[in-house]
Amino acid sequence: MSAGLTIQLIAILISVACSLLGVFLVLRSMSMLTDAISHTILLGIVLSFFITHKLDSPLLIIGATLVGLLTVYLVELITDTNLVKEDAAIGIVLSVLFSIAVVLISKYTANIHLDIDTVLLGEIAFAPFHTEEIFGFKIASGIINGLSILILNLLVITIFFKEIKISIFDRALALTLGLFPEVFHYLLMSLVSVTAVISFDIVGA
């Protein structure tokens, strides 16, 4: 497979994986919150890297997911005080967590792949050069990761489509039916965090 085709395929996989979640997030008026998550997960990546010293460790995904959920929790916590509106709360949490991550990167991760330019800008053009061998075939890691997160998102949405749909359009009905909308809310946010960190590795923030 040519480098150009590989890049296009990776871009398509990541785009579709993100758009699957994006539909529900727009319906819930959470597009700005997910923008915050896509940046604050950088802190989880950095902290996990400090622990493992490996850029390919699964702990990076776990750390990023936890920070993504922390972002949602902090935004809701600040909003519930009624001192500021949700958009202001998002701005506060985004600025604090993302700036901490950038400071840590610039100060403690010199001369390694985890640098500010790579994180903020990304470079999908290099994706074809990072490959994994499967059944004797060399396949770009971006294709494997993109396809994996696409399948994960598709499976979760397919299995819980009814529950997610009811939780979005009628929270009271969801509670009446015992569907626990908060569970599906954080499930959706977890998928957003995982999808974002996979995309981070390929195209940056």
Regions found by a protein language model. Give the residues of each.
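Membrane-interfacial amphipathic/re-entrant helices at transmembrane-helix boundaries
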Residues: 1-17
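Short juxtamembrane and helix-loop transition motifs at transmembrane-helix boundaries
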Residues: 1-3, 20-30, 49-58, 165-175, ...
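Interfacial loop-to-helix junctions that mark the boundaries of transmembrane helices
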Residues: 1-6, 54-62, 83-86, 134-145
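Hydrophobic alpha-helical transmembrane segments
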Residues: 8-13, 58-66, 89-92, 143-148, ...
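Generic alpha-helical transmembrane segments of integral inner-membrane proteins
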Residues: 12, 16-20, 66-73, 100, ...
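Short loop segments and helix-boundary regions at transmembrane helix junctions
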Residues: 23-113
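Transmembrane helix-bundle core of multi-pass membrane transporters
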Residues: 100-156
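Helix-loop-helix "hairpin" substructures at the membrane interface of multi-pass membrane proteins
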Residues: 138-205
